[in-house]
Regions:
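Trp- and acidic/polar-enriched beta-sheet ligand-binding modules for extracellular glycan
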Residues: 12-89, 109-244, 253-254, 264-346
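A short glycine/threonine-centered beta-strand motif
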Residues: 94, 249-251
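General structural concept
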Residues: 90-92, 101
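N-terminal amphipathic/basic-hydrophobic helices that include classical n-h-c signal peptides
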Residues: 1-16
Length: 346
């Protein structure tokens, strides 16, 4: 059984409140990101910048004075100036179908060349390319865009979608398209050991206190982190605080191995970390789970971390307890590339 031993967090550290900017946690992930298998399958034009950049999971950048053969290099999708009727659009196939809750149409660094307006349509198809007779549903009506801005919108239609169409009127550039939602995963895991904190298996980030330099959902992504930006990283802590992230596992299960990967984090990795866990059967809100998590049992006691390394823990784990939520505490702050919790689903 898990034992409530180790560092008594609430007695030593102040418990930081959730920052208001964490608006896309609560189990939502970016369904459009390329590392989940999402692909651009059609675009009317990409003269100035290729459409595939719009689903890059990392934030857009601006390269001062950099030009390619067609003009200024831009980190996003940019079409040529339209000299005829109509508008430009692209079609995105999601890596996994899902229910869409929120979107962000990001025009960062596009100023004077952003679209006048944009809209979104969606459909469900088992084929790579939707048929011509398939009906597209408007999920975001035509709205004006601003230069160098994030455009956040809630999506009311909670149908399952597999394809997204981004319309830009009449032309222009968009840095990133974020489709935040819940992935539909066929959870037929059997008796094999799997990573219960992998987003591809259905794990989701619920709430964290900070993600200033790196998004919390990165920690659940497949594969090895590409760089320091491909991980969860918090701001520098000033005081007796610690940072934390709560994850809902892909399925309830018993954990037999934990891997904490600090790849690329060399001068900014956490000094120590601990893991708490719980098995919760009732539906709980992100707000209520924060307070309850302080009393969760310790899955992994306070352990030392090192730079740019995969830390594997077996013997130090408190085993033989079914869990479906994990809370990772990092002391006092810093960055982690991936967390992998291996076990069998039950």
């Amino acid at each position: 059984m898990l034992q409530n031993i180790g560092l008594k967090i609430t007695q030593i550290y102040k418990f930081p409140m959730v920052e208001k900017k964490n608006i896309f946690l609560n189990g939502l992930i970016d369904l459009a990101q390329s590392r989940l298998g999402s692909k651009i399958i059609y675009k009317t034009d990409e003269f100035f910048a290729p459409a595939k950049r719009i689903i890059n999971p990392w934030p857009p950048v601006f390269k001062e004075g950099v030009f390619d053969k067609n003009g200024k290099w831009m980190d996003g999708w940019e079409t040529r100036r339209k000299r005829s009727k109509g508008h430009d659009y692209l079609i995105l196939k999601l890596g996994r179908p899902g229910k869409i809750h929120k979107v962000d149409i990001d025009t960062s660094y596009f100023s004077g060349n952003q679209p006048s307006k944009v809209s979104l349509e969606a459909c469900f198809s088992k084929k790579k390319t939707p048929g011509k007779n398939l009906k597209w549903i408007t999920i975001l009506k035509k709205i004006p865009t601003k230069p160098n801005s994030h455009h956040y919108f809630n999506i009311k239609n909670k149908s399952i979608f597999s394809h997204i169409k981004l319309n830009i009127f009449p032309d222009g550039g968009v840095a990133r398209l974020r489709i935040y939602g819940s992935m539909i995963v066929k959870k037929r895991f059997g008796k094999k050991t799997l990573n219960l904190t992998s987003v591809l298996n259905g794990a989701t980030p619920i709430v964290c206190n900070n993600e200033h330099f790196g998004r919390a959902e990165n920690i659940l992504a497949p594969g090895t982190g590409k760089n320091m930006g491909d991980g969860w990283e918090t701001r520098r802590s000033r005081g007796k605080n610690f940072d934390w992230l709560i994850i809902k596992c892909a399925a309830p299960g018993k954990i037999n191995k934990i891997q904490i990967d600090t790849h690329h984090f060399k001068g900014n990795y956490p000094d120590k970390c601990s893991l708490q866990a719980a098995y919760i059967t009732k539906k709980v809100s992100s707000k209520s789970i924060i307070g309850k998590s302080t009393n969760w049992k310790f899955l992994l006691n306070n352990v030392k971390l090192y730079a740019n390394r995969k830390h594997n823990f077996r013997n130090k784990l408190m085993k033989n307890q079914k869990i479906n939520y994990i809370k990772i505490n990092i002391f006092p702050d810093g960055g982690i590339s991936r967390i992998r919790a291996f076990g069998k689903a039950e």
